[in-house]
Amino acid sequence: MAEFINQIPGYEKGRVQRITATDEVSESFIVAQMASDLRKKWNTSVLCISLDGHKEAIESLIPQEKAVGTVYVLDQNNPEFKVVLRKATGIINRRFVRALIISGAERLTAKYFQNHPEKGREWIASHLEGLSRGMGIPVILVRVHEDQSEV
């Protein structure tokens, strides 16, 4: 699993990366590993937003070693994209966060774009690309593989 984490492209500033996990446990592990890795590599803080209620799991998997940055984990159980984006932008601006990881990304389109998932994915992608390029940070979307929904 650690080799997989190191091979993930997406640690580039100003880029949105999508990653698919096999199950919810590996999703939490991937998020925690990437957050820890980014914190160590860049000596900066990382914001993780859990859209599927895995805040405690992610926090418990993040190594507690001394590092310059902090990993903030936000639990957003009712994911309306505009609310998630607004909260993320506020935290990024106030806390000097230089990477954003969103877990449970398949839920972003579920609420408002059920009838038009492709339109929802395009809308979300354009807003995340704007956030990523505008602030110069990587945005990483981690989702559990499900055939019927895709972000």
Model-flagged regions — what are they?
Residues 114-127, 151:
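Substrate-gripping "pore-loop 1 plus following alpha2 helix"
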Residues 1-66:
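The Walker A/P-loop phosphate-binding site
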Residues 4-7, 35, 81-89, 128:
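Generic hydrophobic alpha-helical segments
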Residues 34-37, 123-134:
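Catalytic-core regions built around general acid/base machinery
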Residues 129-151:
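Phosphate-binding/switch region of NTP-binding enzymes
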Residues 43-114, 118:
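Conserved inter-motif catalytic segment of the P-loop NTP-binding fold
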Residues 30, 83, 123:
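Short, conserved clusters of charged catalytic residues that mark active-site
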Residues 18, 99-103, 140:
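Structural motif
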